[in-house]
């Protein structure tokens, strides 16, 4: 016991010696510290970023100028990906099919596309996963031509007619089929025509080559303002989406191979952070903010039209990137009804999306 006491006293003496030998802070030191604290008081708290497994990311998208992918555009234009340490290269695919092929072949790391594509891949035993949601409604409207369907009264009048969709098998095709079925018209009783999402679709409707159209923004608003179309079903709103699908319908998302997500969790988190940051910005963005941020070419030579289209889809944008609880089930049911090769019992819904990244980003950005 005596030995232990001596050790204690010896340690105490060393502690006192160390304290006495430490230089006392001078007035200059105190002033410097105060200035440093004052200088950093207004700066945001920096979040320590874990090391990214992959910093250079190839992302493929079909129709990036569409409002369907506005969160991606905003995150890119405002430098949110760079801020997260991501060197993002966005490649425009010629079609949804081409975008799908790019990500499934490994030519692209990530795809910005419809959640339905993930369900379709999973039904074929190709394991892909959505890791952040951009849209909580499809933003697609179905309308009839005012030229060839003048005096339109009922969906039954569309039997035997030509219906324009962005692409065969696309969300616009699925929605057109559902709307027709609700009106007693089978999809095989009409002729679907792939017209894309650009000016060519408008020209086809304007010249009488189409009798109806199912498409996305800003194309629909442009056709409405020109008096070329009369909208009869609208998933640009949450209410309209429930009317068509009976529940929430997830739309655009970022998705990748499940193995890629598992091996690159920090990278996926960084990309999710960028998208959720963009989604939060969009919640309060005014017309001037949109005009200053979105590339001029996306406006199709009409800023007013683009802003009108934005307001029509605004509520369809996800507020936080999180997949809604009933969304996957609603989407799978719609896919199974549209495509007989998609079997509900063959798709494990929990494996088609990952909410962990979005939940963390939501907390970080208070989205």
Describe each PLM feature range.
Residues 332-367:
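Conserved C-terminal helix/tail region of periplasmic/extracytoplasmic solute-binding proteins
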Residues 63, 244-245, 323:
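Short Gly/Pro-enriched turn/cap motifs at secondary-structure boundaries
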Residues 1-25:
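Secretory targeting signals
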Residues 261-342:
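Secondary-structure end/capping motifs
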Residues 200-295:
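Pocket-lining segment of extracytoplasmic ligand-binding domains
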Residues 49-197, 204-217, 221, 228, ...:
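Short, glycine-/small- and polar/acidic-enriched structural segments
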Residues 75, 115, 174, 254-255, ...:
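A generic alpha-helix surface/boundary motif
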Residues 22, 29-48:
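N-terminal export signals
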